[in-house]
């Protein structure tokens, strides 16, 4: 066969294309151009392409910039024919596999007894590769890279392996560091009996490409001290029958092929937490890994240690479970500003979808002139009282993941907006917690559903009901909105009048906001949502808009009480929900379950059982001024006494012993929706399982005792 007849191998899929092809027939990748061989330009000693290429024959003896591989270096007739004679071509993807492989390394297809592209001489020699002399280029193959590892140094920026002579990285021009030792994982022949040398070669390539934007760990440890103990993982997975191993072989191999360098570092850090190896955690942190990363099902299967690892665990979970106080202090410092959020709706997606279907099924449109949508179920979300039974470190972890700490701080500390009454927050167990939600324009709808059903408005079911209600009942809501805007402007001394066309334009803008997913909503939309819920909504919010410099820009106008005034009182519930507002963002304010109260308010008669949780929501601010009631008509407007009377008609109100006017929010776990209760239990079980172990081991001894 002449040199013109030699095909060129695609550097992406290894398919061998005809010399005339400029793109790969399989993956359409561009044909590789000439490879850079030396640092300085050189003149070829001979035009004979059949002569063996020798790195030492380059002018001045300069070292290669890019290590040539089997597909990029000049082809030699003898070695090319021997290479094809030793490997067998896959009938599915044409990948050239080593003779001892019984399955294709790329697609895992079974090897045929005689491949169509295999030469007659090689068809019967699959048991042992034919010995052949290695040319000077063969030392750069993946098979022989281990022997020349000390001749390279790894760039700490792009992870490219440069020759020892290079003073800076060939790819990114980063200066050569003082320490040239590189961290490599699973490169030795003894690391695993399952991964063959082609797997390791492809894995190393994926590490270089997948982590080119991340800093490799600049650790001073040697490879043997920080590399992943793959043999321990392999041996742990070898427990079981031969049939089970054969079934799991393909799955485990696929998982390993997808793993990148950062993934192995993360698994190494997880094992390091269990075994008390702080160096593994430092290596993962130095590589830029996410401390809040959670274990996936595939990673747990690869670790194969159920007594120690579980899906969803982070390094913090493991440190708490195995009582690694020194590691916990380091990890909590790292994640204090960027804690991974985990609300109940995230733990069980199947239950969350069922709840969304329940909400959609409970939405109905009332017949008649006021054709507004409404919910048929009364549901109030509260944090379970079982949280208090968890260890303090686990409680702190739970609150970091479910609460919005920034909102909580702004509403409590920067301004006394919630929990300002010690009587309500402590003695009456009515402390409010700000739940974390999405920060987009859907935060109002998310917070409303979180305060009731504990989930997001992911499918925009509530937004659609909001838009349809505004559109179908436009006349009713428009009249209320127009009268309220006129009165509010006059109350601030702004006496002006608008043409009807201007009012209509502003109203059309409000309607358009309701129909756009992600668009921010206004006070009118809260008023409509109170009618959809058929219950009052109390908003506790900051009073002023402020710039990033802290300058006051204007009034927010969100704080107050929103009553479903267009419904009959008998059609509505008197148990309100509470929302928090902070600089363009709404959050659900929920309480924690308590045992209920008998007669805590002056003049209040609460005939409740022990299962009912009563939360006392203040109807006054920290200065004891009554909260505004929004969207009142001209007949309903009056002095503070008249507004308080109106509040008592629409809410279950009482006055505490401290003289605070409050509204009672009632909820019951037994009477709550069963799907919500089940979702909360599954979410709480996640934290119950990370209790610190009583023993110094990983809990395996306890399991053995139980089995006995």
Swiss-Prot record:
Keywords from the named record: ANK repeat, Cytoplasm, Hydrolase, Metal-binding, Nucleus, Protease, Repeat, Thiol protease, Ubl conjugation pathway, Wnt signaling pathway, Zinc, Zinc-finger
Gene3D superfamilies cross-referenced by the UniProt entry: 1.25.40.560, Zinc finger, RanBP2-type
Enzyme class: hydrolase
Active site, per annotation: 443, 585
One Gene Ontology biological process: protein K63-linked deubiquitination
DNA repair recorded as keyword: no
GO cellular component, one term: cytoplasm
Record region (Disordered): 38-73, 200-223
Known role: Ubiquitin thioesterase, which specifically hydrolyzes 'Lys-29'-linked and 'Lys-33'-linked diubiquitin. Also cleaves 'Lys-63'-linked chains, but with 40-fold less efficiency compared to 'Lys-29'-linked ones. Positive regulator of the Wnt signaling pathway that deubiquitinates APC protein, a negative regulator of Wnt-mediated transcription. Acts as a regulator of autophagy by mediating deubiquitination of PIK3C3/VPS34, thereby promoting autophagosome maturation. Plays a role in the regulation of cell morphology and cytoskeletal organization.
Note on domains (UniProt): The RanBP2-type zinc fingers, also called NZFs, mediate the interaction with ubiquitin and determine linkage specificity. RanBP2-type zinc fingers 1 and 2 (also named NZF1 and NZF2) specifically recognize and bind 'Lys-29'- and 'Lys-33'-linked ubiquitin. RanBP2-type zinc finger 3 (also named NZF3) binds 'Lys-33'-linked ubiquitin and shows weak binding to 'Lys-6'-, 'Lys-48'- and 'Lys-63'-linked ubiquitin chains but it does not interact with 'Lys-29'-linked chains. The OTU domain mediates the deubiquitinating activity.
Similarity section: Belongs to the peptidase C64 family.
Protein name: Ubiquitin thioesterase ZRANB1
Primary gene name: ZRANB1
């Amino acid at each position: 066969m002449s040199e013109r007849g030699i095909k060129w191998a695609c550097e992406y899929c290894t398919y061998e294309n005809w010399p005339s092809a400029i793109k790969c027939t399989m993956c359409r990748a561009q044909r590789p151009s000439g490879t850079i061989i030396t640092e300085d330009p050189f003149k070829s000693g001979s035009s004979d392409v059949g002569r063996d290429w020798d790195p030492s024959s380059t002018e001045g003896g300069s070292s290669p910039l890019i290590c040539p591989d089997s597909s990029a270096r000049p082809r030699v007739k003898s070695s090319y024919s021997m290479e094809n004679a030793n490997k067998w071509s896959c009938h599915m993807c044409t990948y050239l596999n080593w003779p001892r492989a019984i399955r294709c390394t790329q697609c895992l297809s079974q090897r045929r007894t005689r491949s169509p592209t295999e030469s007659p001489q090689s068809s019967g020699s699959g048991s042992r590769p034919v010995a052949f002399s290695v040319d000077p280029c063969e030392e750069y193959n993946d098979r022989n890279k281990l022997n020349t590892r000390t001749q390279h140094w790894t760039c700490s920026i792009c992870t490219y392996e440069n020759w020892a002579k290079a003073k800076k990285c060939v790819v990114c021009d980063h200066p050569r560091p003082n320490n040239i030792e590189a961290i490599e994982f699973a490169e030795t022949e003894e690391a695993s009996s399952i991964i063959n040398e082609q797997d390791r070669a492809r894995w190393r390539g994926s590490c270089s490409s997948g982590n080119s934007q991340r800093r490799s760990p600049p650790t001073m440890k040697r490879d043997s001290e920080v590399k992943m103990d793959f043999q321990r993982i392999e041996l742990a997975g070898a427990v079981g029958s031969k049939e089970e191993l054969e079934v799991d072989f393909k799955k485990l191999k696929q998982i390993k092929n997808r793993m990148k360098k950062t993934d192995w570092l993360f698994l190494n850090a997880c094992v390091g937490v269990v075994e008390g190896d702080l160096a593994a955690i430092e290596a993962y942190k130095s590589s830029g890994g996410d401390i809040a990363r959670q274990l996936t099902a595939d990673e747990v299967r690869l670790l194969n240690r159920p007594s120690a690892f579980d899906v969803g665990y982070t390094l913090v979970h493991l440190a708490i479970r195995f009582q690694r106080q020194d590691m916990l202090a380091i990890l909590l410092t790292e994640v204090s500003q960027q804690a991974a959020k985990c609300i109940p709706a995230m733990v069980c997606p199947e239950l969350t979808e069922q709840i969304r279907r329940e909400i959609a099924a409970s939405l109905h449109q009332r017949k008649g002139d006021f054709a507004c949508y409404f919910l048929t179920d009364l549901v109030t979300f509260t944090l379970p009282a079982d949280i208090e039974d968890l260890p303090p470190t686990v409680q702190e972890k739970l609150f970091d993941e479910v609460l919005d700490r920034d909102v909580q701080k702004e509403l409590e500390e920067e301004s006394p907006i919630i929990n300002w009454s010690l009587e309500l927050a402590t003695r009456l167990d009515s402390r409010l917690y700000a739940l974390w939600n999405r920060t987009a324009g859907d935060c109002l709808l998310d917070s409303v559903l979180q305060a009731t059903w504990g989930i997001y408005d992911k499918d925009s079911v509530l937004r659609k009901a909001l838009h349809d209600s505004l559109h179908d009942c436009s006349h009713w809501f428009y009249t209320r909105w127009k009268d309220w805007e006129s009165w509010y402007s006059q109350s601030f001394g702004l006496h002006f009048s608008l043409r009807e066309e201007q009012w209509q334009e502003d109203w059309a803008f409000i309607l358009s906001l309701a129909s756009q997913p992600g668009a921010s909503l206004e006070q009118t939309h809260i008023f409509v949502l109170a009618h959809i819920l058929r219950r009052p909504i109390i908003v506790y919010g900051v009073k002023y808009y402020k710039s990033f410099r802290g300058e006051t820009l204007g009034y927010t106008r969100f704080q107050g009480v929103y009553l479903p005034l267009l419904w009959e009182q008998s059609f509505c519930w008197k148990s309100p929900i509470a929302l928090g507002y902070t600089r363009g963002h709404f959050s659900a304010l929920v309480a924690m379950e308590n045992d209920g109260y008998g007669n805590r308010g002056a003049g209040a008669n609460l005939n409740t059982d022990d299962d009912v949780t009563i939360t006392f929501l203040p109807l006054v601010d920290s200065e004891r001024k009554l909260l505004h009631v929004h969207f009142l008509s001209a007949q309903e407007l009056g002095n503070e006494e008249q507004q308080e009377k109106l509040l008592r008609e629409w809410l279950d109100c009482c006055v505490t012993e401290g003289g605070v006017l409050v509204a009672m929010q009632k909820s019951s776990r037994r009477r709550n929706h069963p799907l919500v209760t089940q979702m909360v239990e599954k979410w709480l079980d996640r934290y119950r399982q990370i209790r610190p172990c009583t023993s110094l081991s990983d809990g395996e001894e306890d399991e053995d005792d139980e089995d006995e």
